[in-house]
Structure formats: C-alpha cells, structure tokens
C-alpha cells in the first residue's frame, strides 16, 4: 500500500533552511496528520540545540523517530561542540550500532556557517546552495525559496516563512502555522 493511503501513517511537516546576508533561518509548519485527519495544527518542529542555542534544527517524519534523532544529535553536539563533527560522529554510530536501525525521519540542522541534512539511515548531506527543504512540502518550499532568493532582497527569515506559507497552500500535509528560528 502506498504510505499516503495508509490511515495509520503520520504525515507531517515541511521544514526549510535558508541562508542570506550572513544569517540562517530554519522554519517549519505546525501540522500533524494521521491518515486523512489533521491531529494537530500547532506542533513545534523547529528548535535551538546545543549549550548556547547556536544550532537550529527542524525535523520531518515520524515524531518518535525524529525525537530520537534530536536526542542523539544533541548528545553528539554537546560532546563535540561543532555541527559538522557532531553530524559525522552520529553517522558513524549509525553504521556500527544495530539498535539505531532505520529511523523514519530527517533532521535539517544549521549553524552560522553550515547547513546539513541528517537522515534516519545515517547519511549526512550538505546542500550545495545552502538551502535545505525536507518533508512532505519540501519540494514546494525549495522552489519558493530559490525564486525568492533569486528575485528579491528579502531576508532569510522572511524567505523561510514565505516558503512554508507557499508550501502550505499546495501540500495537504502542511499548514501556514509557521515557527521560525534565526541566527
């Protein structure tokens, strides 16, 4: 069965990370959907991580798996103190610890210098253009962000917010209840 047709699968989230003018913003919508029903409209899927809150993170996918990814990543961040190193160390653990298995989630993480996608299979990906878009409406948000970056002077926070709003108008699993954090 196609996962989008399974009434027991949680569909949730569009997350976008945008860089402009020395700033980075991570935004996410607030909708959580179970099957064909909206279960919650104001979930907070974007957070600050690390001792000083200098890493932004947003998640897409199964909530329990996403929170597991958050916890594991934050532990590595606390231990190593640097975004890329923490992500690589988490990926190494993935390859060696069977208990981690395959988590059905993605994290978008960013600090002042770097943006990364961390997958539930242990992959770490740095986008070439500094834009990350994950989740059900990710393609729509990515398209909107690229257009706004290319053709406006809007700041990173505004672009991220508008990208989520545009995705929310198109994707049935995304709403316009935006939470955004910026560095």
From Swiss-Prot:
GO CC entries: cytoplasm; HslUV protease complex; proteasome core complex
Catalytic reaction annotation: ATP-dependent cleavage of peptide bonds with broad specificity
Binding residue positions for Na(+): 168, 171, 174
Regulation: Allosterically activated by HslU binding.
Origin: domain of life: Bacteria
EC number: 3.4.25.2
Keywords, comma-separated and alphabetical: Allosteric enzyme, Cytoplasm, Hydrolase, Metal-binding, Protease, Sodium, Threonine protease
The keyword Protease is assigned to this record: yes
ATP-binding keyword on record: no
SUPFAM superfamilies: N-terminal nucleophile aminohydrolases (Ntn hydrolases)
Pfam families (UniProt xref): Proteasome (PF00227)
Intracellular or extracellular location(s): Cytoplasm
One example GO MF annotation: threonine-type endopeptidase activity
GO biological process: proteolysis involved in protein catabolic process
Active site location: 13
InterPro entries: ATP-dep_Prtase_HsIV_su, Ntn_hydrolases_N, Proteasome_sua/b, Proteasome_suB-type
Assembly description: A double ring-shaped homohexamer of HslV is capped on each side by a ring-shaped HslU homohexamer. The assembly of the HslU/HslV complex is dependent on binding of ATP.
UniProt similarity note: Belongs to the peptidase T1B family. HslV subfamily.
Function summary: Protease subunit of a proteasome-like degradation complex believed to be a general protein degrading machinery.
Official protein name in the record: ATP-dependent protease subunit HslV
Organism: Xanthomonas campestris pv. campestris (strain ATCC 33913 / DSM 3586 / NCPPB 528 / LMG 568 / P 25)
Source species taxonomy: Bacteria, Pseudomonadati, Pseudomonadota, Gammaproteobacteria, Lysobacterales
